[in-house]
Amino acid sequence: MTDVFPTLRGRMEYVCLGCDARYPADSLLYTCPGCGNVFLLETIDFHKLKERSAADWRALFDARAASRITALRGVFRYYEFIAPVLDAQDIVYLGEGITPIVEAAPALRDQIGLSFAYKNDGQNPSASFKDRGMACAFSYLKWLCRRNNWEEVLTVCASTGDTSASAALYAAYVGAPLKSVVLLPAGKVTPQQLSQPLGSGATVLELPGVFDDCMKVVEHLAENYRVALLNSKNSWRILGQESYAYETAQWHDWDVVDLCLFVPVGNAGNITAIMSGFLKLHELGLVTNLPRIFGVQSEHADPVYRYYAAPALARTWQPVRVRPSVAQAAMIGNPVSFPRVRKLAERYIAAGGEKAFQIIQVREQEIMDAMLKANRHGHIACTQGGECLAGLVNALALGLVSRSERALLDATAHSLKFAGFQELYFTDAFSPEYGITPNIDLANRPEALLPRSARNELEDAAYTRKAAEAMAKLLRLSPK
């Protein structure tokens, strides 16, 4: 299948969203040296992609879906759209991308009132969507280290859990010259998520405070020391996460008319990447219409919602102090990618209309109820997946989505990462600051069949019979 291997290479530059300054892509840059704003990466030769027809691009990407070439099996199936400067030998693949889109169970679909599906990004290698961006960021670092013969590069990130798990996993796989350090807000990462960077051998540091505090520390490091920052300020990560848009379009046979995407905002990197990806597809004619994109935020961390809720001429950006949220990955009061969101949302609305991009607010109670309801119907949604379902329900109630449309919800991580919140719900143990009261219809707890002493007091046959009888009575079974 050598005919599917990329032959087109490009030149790339960092483009500052503040002063429009440009810098070469072969350097570790995260913010503009001139004005301090964030970057987007741009392929200077992007116009050359128009030399191939939209139909040919679709056919090529469909052919690559069957490829056994390692460099094309993950997010780099869309190599020319992502990072066409990289060499195949540097591309890192751990099984990321190409995550399943699972239609809502019929009973759940009927409850909600329109056709929708989950894209299960929790089925990435580290069990979250972050692997899309890390695959690109680490491929770039391999390429850069090889070009410069660097002997050691420290990769650093602040995290609420998923970023650290992903960064540590990819650093462990690549190995020298890369080493991983992660900084976490003490006590605000689930035990399941904490176990991941520890298991991958990263240096794990904890800091009192919240994610925003950790972010300021690693930003200071990146500005004053030669380290590789792996948060979404890293523009290479945004490129890898664009693959979500490309996969979504390809799965729907490049027809995204009447499709509404619901995406948790968090640090705003993912919604940035998805808009950027669809804008590229639209510019090249691979999709004829843009899907509508709804960012979703909890009322406990909703700066982007507040910005867009204001009249257009009265909007001012204002970070917020976050309150505890079960959607931990989205519990960010000052998302670093907001300047990208604002810039790309302008372009997205210009191309798709005023209703093409909107932000929805949800309550913590709605997030937990929606997550449990989804998983009660056979899904594996995390709290962010619950946030998206709650956003869909609210959008329907507000008349922002019609029942003739279809929706795709982003389950950013695997539900097992948030088993602790499920346990708090089932045992009614949430602290008052969350504002969550369990719905008895969604709560679930194990029931004891026999007292613990029964195992030692009864012979095997009697023990089995007594347990079976207790089970039959509990389940109201009728004898044959």
Label the predicted regions.
Residues 139-147, 165-177, 279, 390-400:
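Alpha-helix C-terminal capping segments
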Residues 221-285, 368-373:
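Active-site/ligand-binding-proximal alpha/beta "capping" segment
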Residues 2-93:
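N-terminal juxtadomain amphipathic helix
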Residues 147-170, 177-185, 257-267, 293, ...:
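A short, small-residue-rich loop immediately preceding and capping a beta-strand
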Residues 71-147:
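Positively charged, low-complexity intrinsically disordered leader regions
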Residues 263, 364-421:
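Claisen-condensing/thiolase-fold acyl-transfer catalytic domains that form or cleave C-C bonds
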Residues 131-137, 156-174, 190-192, 267-274, ...:
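Short glycine/serine/threonine-rich phosphate/pyrophosphate-binding segments
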Residues 98, 193-195, 205, 209-229, ...:
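Active-site/ligand-binding loops adjacent to catalytic centers
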